[in-house]
Amino acid sequence: MKILKKHLNTVTMKVKITLMFAVVLAVQACQAQDLSDSQITVKILSYNIYHGATTRGDYNLDVIARVITDADPDLVALQEVDFNTNRSGHIDLATELGIRTHMAPLFGRAMYYDGGEYGEGILSKYTFIRTRNVPLPYTPGNEPRTALEAVVVLPSGDTIAFVGTHFDHLNPETDRVAQAEKVNDVFTSSPYPIILAGDLNAQPGSIPIKILEEIWSASYDKIYPEPTFPSDAPRKTIDYVMHFPGERWETLETKVICDSIASDHCAYLVTLKLLKD
């Protein structure tokens, strides 16, 4: 009887250990899944920073940096970025914002301006492994435009490309149409899943946006697109995040962040999930 009881106790202990081991494995599997999901989720912010000036007319980069930091993006496309211009006090806006947000900065010149340079910026939580600055077509006499690209590696090990741009603001939309066509021609041949973000100065349904959406998938609500400009009373949707190819990305969340002091534009935050092949 004692032998049988001892045997039963041993079996019971083995069952308990087995169950505990199974629970541990299940928890580890869930944690691994959560980690995997977080590793392939990318938060993108598009932000026209009004050449570093607030809507009050002063230069307060801490206000702009706070909007970015509070949004906690992985990659930021900055538009209207000054480098060493007279009006911004001869500072490097991209680098200064990078310092304040603890992100790697990148600047791409669209034109020489006011004793310095003016163009696009990118901030990134990840190291740049390749960058390029692509001039976009424009009508002589109009403002030159560019598209700035950075290739980065995510914590998951996946490589993606990120492009920030700022299309022409004038009418007719001749330059915007040409710029949309150039972006399609240049960047959709990327060997990596790619994200496009920026102030496109065009509303949903316009010709430039239709051209882009022939190839790119947009993140905004097609039925009720949320306006992003001006920041004090938004009524126009002109800031975008798009991605390509469509089957590699899923839009998880979008958010328009309006700080009426930091800039005349709202910031546009989009959370994307990179899907496996």
Segments the model singles out, each with a brief description of its role:
Residues T85-H90, M103-I122, G141-P144, P191, ...:
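Active site of divalent-metal-dependent phosphoester/diester hydrolases
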Residues L35, T41, R56-G57, L75, ...:
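Structured beta-strand-rich core segments of catalytic domains in phosphoester-bond hydrolases
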Residues Y47-Y50, Q79-V81, G108-M111, S124-Y126, ...:
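Active-site-proximal beta-strand/loop segments in catalytic clefts of secreted hydrolases
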